[in-house]
Curated annotation (Swiss-Prot):
Keywords: Antioxidant, Chloroplast, Disulfide bond, Oxidoreductase, Peroxidase, Plastid, Redox-active center, Thylakoid, Transit peptide. Its main location: plastid. Residues 38-186 form the Thioredoxin domain. Its EC number is 1.11.1.24. Residues 1-36 form a transit peptide. It comes from Sedum lineare (Needle stonecrop). This is Peroxiredoxin Q, chloroplastic. It catalyses: a hydroperoxide + [thioredoxin]-dithiol = an alcohol + [thioredoxin]-disulfide + H2O. It is found in: Plastid, Chloroplast thylakoid lumen. Thiol-specific peroxidase that catalyzes the reduction of hydrogen peroxide and organic hydroperoxides to water and alcohols, respectively. Plays a role in cell protection against oxidative stress by detoxifying peroxides.
Length: 186
């Protein structure tokens, strides 16, 4: 007999609505869940995803200027909200460095629109429903694959990765590290 509940819980920035959201810790770990495919010095795979307004946005749109691409687990969760607001609060510093900021999660465009409006986020949020881009970039998962990873990439004006930063539990550190790198690119 199986008992199912529809309870929701949160764990370090990820919403779980069903017990089936969890993968067994004994499940074999895939190589790409541990090691990033996109590394410093590489050119990441191109993508086109919908933004918070439902418009398609391609990575190639940002060529010619540095871009900060940050992957985060989910909208409206404590760690992700803290990280997004930290990017918002430092947004002028990113603009002064000539950089664009782009956040990517598996949430829908509608969720991103509400999230951006609620927290007055001035940058682009992209919907990677199904986590295709996350997988192509090799963004690692945490906690035996149960938690989508939090990883930040800084691409230079030529689209080459200059920084890969991963810190699941201190989201605000992503801003400090990316700004340091952007200052060194000037």
């Amino acid at each position: 007999q199986t008992l199912q509940t529809s309870s929701q819980s949160q764990f370090h920035g990820l919403k779980f609505s069903h017990a089936s959201s969890f993968k067994s810790p004994s499940a074999p770990l895939r190589k790409n869940s541990i090691f990033a495919k996109v590394t410093k010095g590489s050119t990441p795979p191109p993508f086109t995803l919908k933004d918070q307004e439902g418009r398609p946005v391609s990575l190639s749109k940002f060529k010619g200027k540095p871009v900060v691409v940050y992957f985060y687990p989910a909208d409206e969760t404590p760690g992700c909200t803290k990280q997004a607001c930290a990017f918002r609060d430092s947004y002028e510093k990113f603009k002064k460095a000539g950089a664009e900021v782009v956040g990517i999660s598996g949430d829908s465009s509608e969720s991103h629109k509400a999230f951006a409006k609620k927290y007055k986020l001035p940058f682009t949020l992209l919907s990677d429903e199904g986590n295709k881009v996350r997988k192509e970039w090799g963004v690692p998962s945490d906690l035996f694959g149960t938690l989508p990873g939090r990883e930040t990439y800084v691409l230079d004006k030529n689209g080459v990765v200059q920084l890969v930063y991963n810190n699941q539990f201190q989201p605000e550190k992503h801003i400090d590290e990316t700004l340091k790198l952007l200052q060194s690119l000037k």
